[in-house]
UniProtKB/Swiss-Prot annotation:
Keyword set includes Amino-acid biosynthesis: no
Cofactor annotation: Mn(2+)
One Pfam family per UniProt: Fucose_iso_C
Pathway(s) served: Carbohydrate degradation; L-fucose degradation; L-lactaldehyde and glycerone phosphate from L-fucose: step 1/3
Protein name: L-fucose isomerase
Chain's role: Converts the aldose L-fucose into the corresponding ketose L-fuculose.
Length: 591
């Protein structure tokens, strides 16, 4: 099967078309802007898979309709999914703009005095607004000299933020969400909304019953050699934790081995269903070898599977991590309980950062008073205003233990292409695998147990669907916090000490849902959330605007908010602008 090519970024150098001196004097400067933009993006950005982002520059500067059409023909043949138009001068607005309504687009107008790049920028954006094709504006804060070929820091920030979000849009388009199973325990996010995926994300939904997973396991529709490798890897790296089950529910060594084997097989088969596996074709299983072109998936599990078969915790935790028995690799996106909306938040975070995502229940708000009452100790530092306990039954990416280290030696979660094998091993060493609690999971399983290191910046997100409004996005930037061991042990034991825990302190603003930690918890729109490494809420906001998903809750600084220029025409309050603009333009892939 031919591998699908990655989307590219097209660079469109536009120019004043008047000959006899004007165009000729601008050719080199204009094309150099395009080359500098392409060089910046190719140097600084990677796709979520780790490949360098490739830029395609128009063959000539664009002065009018003919050259614009020639550029479009080139871009169409090279899978350009995002465009950036650059110019240092006046050009002919509507004659030179990118008119593709589905492609994210930005215009960088050079801030110089010799030629009016800013005037073209304003004229072109006016044309975009009038035609209903939103575009992002890039204009440097400070005037540059005409021969200054550098890219100012503020321009670079906008170029890269736009490019990251635009590539996420282009990368999701045409892919599928694999819904493995149906609705889990009445969780609304697992009532998979096909229209949402099709109209807002440009994706399809592949619905597959869990009996297909059972068939693949029972009929050995997998690579049997790889299974042996996976078992040997687990034998080497898995540390087993406390079994809290009553004696009558504890499994012996043979039974536990069978549960481990099936859990690893689930990981292999779900992966194969998502992306395919040529090894299956070698066994004569050509149809199964193709997979479903899924960029994200969800597994229902509870309860129709888990009441008799091992749960999905081990499979999901390993798939969501940046490593397994094959070494370090790109993490998959697999949502627990088939919560497709949390899966979309995971997908957004992965596409923007290239990192693994931590799926969690937004479980408990612990106030300072409650913590002191229960433990006899006060919360201090970033935790002083209270904390949110993020914990689920063990499907969180193991990267979430934060045993990886950044350049300064701080705990973090790296993009998979930066992870060393010893860092992957450290994440495994920090994880215990605890037998699943029988009352929850009658078919057994193993839950990963780890504690996220403190002081790590995170962004928590969630997509919700509101009837009559459509999808909305929630964003809460904050930090993981480290509690004294005795305090952690007491609080953790009140929920389930065999599950992975992150203690999260959102950054407070003193206003609205971020007036205090309680309000963050109270305003969260569902029982699940996603942790993405870093304070990357601004990137989520830009991506959401491209998809026409309004942001209903965030604590991102106003100076970092970057949306299409037309949003400014939808009122003076920036959050109201977002709602009105998203309603006005409708979903990106209108249905």
């Amino acid at each position: 099967m031919k591998k699908i090519s990655l989307p590219k970024i097209g660079i469109r150098p536009v120019i004043d078309g008047r000959r006899m001196g004007v165009r000729e004097s601008l050719e080199a400067q204009t094309m150099n802007m395009a080359k500098a933009t392409a060089a910046l993006i190719s140097e600084k950005l990677r796709h979520a898979c780790g490949a360098r982002v490739e830029c395609v520059i128009a063959d000539t500067c664009i002065a009018g309709m003919a050259e614009s059409a020639a550029c479009e023909e080139k871009f169409s043949s090279q899978n350009v999914g995002v465009t950036i138009t650059v110019t240092p001068c006046w050009c002919y607005g509507s004659e030179t703009i990118d008119m593709d309504p589905l492609r994210p687009k930005a215009i960088w107008g050079f801030n110089g005095t010799e030629r009016p790049g800013a005037v073209y920028l304003a004229a072109a954006l006016a044309a975009h607004s009038q035609k209903g094709i939103p575009a992002f504006s890039i204009y440097g804060h400070d005037v540059q000299d005409a021969d200054d070929t550098s890219i100012p820091a503020d321009v670079e920030e906008k170029l890269l933020r736009f490019a990251r979000a635009g590539l996420a849009v282009a990368s999701m388009k045409g892919k599928s969400y694999l819904s493995l199973g149906g609705v889990s325990m009445g969780i609304a996010g697992s009532i998979v909304d096909h229209n949402f995926f099709e109209s807002w994300l440009g994706m399809k939904v592949q619905a597959v019953d869990m009996t297909e997973l059972r068939r693949r396991i029972d009929q050995k529709i997998y690579d049997e050699t790889e299974l042996e490798m996976a078992l040997a890897w687990a034998d080497k790296h898995f540390r087993y934790g406390e079994d809290q089950n009553a004696e009558q529910y504890k499994r012996n060594e043979t039974q536990s081995r069978a549960v481990l084997k099936e859990s690893l097989l689930m990981a292999m088969c779900i992966r194969d269903m998502m992306q395919g596996n040529p090894k299956l074709a070698e066994k004569g299983l050509v149809e199964e070898s193709l997979g479903y072109n899924a960029i994200a998936a969800g597994f229902q599990g509870q309860r129709h599977w888990t009441d008799q078969y091992p749960n999905g915790d081990t499979a999901e935790a390993l798939l969501n991590s940046s490593f397994d028995w094959n070494g370090v690799r790109e993490p998959f996106v697999v949502a627990t309980e088939n919560d497709s909306l949390n899966g979309v938040a995971m997908l957004m975070g992965h596409q923007l950062t290239g990192t693994a995502q931590v799926f969690a229940d937004v479980r408990t708000y612990w106030s300072p008073d409650a913590v002191e009452r229960v433990t006899g100790q006060p919360l201090t530092g970033r935790a002083e205003h209270g904390i949110i306990h993020l914990i689920n039954s063990g499907s969180a990416a193991l990267d979430g233990s934060c045993q990886q280290r950044d350049a300064q030696g701080n705990p973090t979660m790296k993009p998979h292409w930066e992870i060393e094998q010893n860092e992957a091993d450290a994440c495994l060493a920090a994880t215990e695998w605890c037998p699943a609690i029988h009352e929850y999971f009658r078919g057994g399983g193993f839950s990963s147990r780890f504690l996220t290191e403190g002081g790590v910046p995170f962004t928590m997100t969630r997509v919700n669907i509101i009837k009559g409004l459509g999808p909305v996005l929630q964003i809460a930037e904050g930090w993981s916090v480290a509690l004294p061991k005795a305090m952690h042990d007491q609080l953790d034991a009140r929920t389930n000490s065999t599950w992975p825990t992150t203690w999260f302190a959102p950054r407070l603003t003193g206003k609205g849902p971020f007036s205090d930690v309680y309000s963050v918890m109270a305003n969260w729109g569902a029982n699940h959330g996603v942790l993405t490494i870093g304070h990357v809420g601004a990137d989520f906001i830009t991506l959401a605007a491209m998809l026409r998903i309004p942001v209903c809750m965030h604590n991102v600084e106003a100076a970092k908010i970057y949306r299409p220029s037309a949003w400014a025409a939808h009122g003076m309050d920036i959050e109201g602008q977002d709602y009105r603009a998203c309603q006005n333009y409708g979903p990106l892939y209108k249905r």
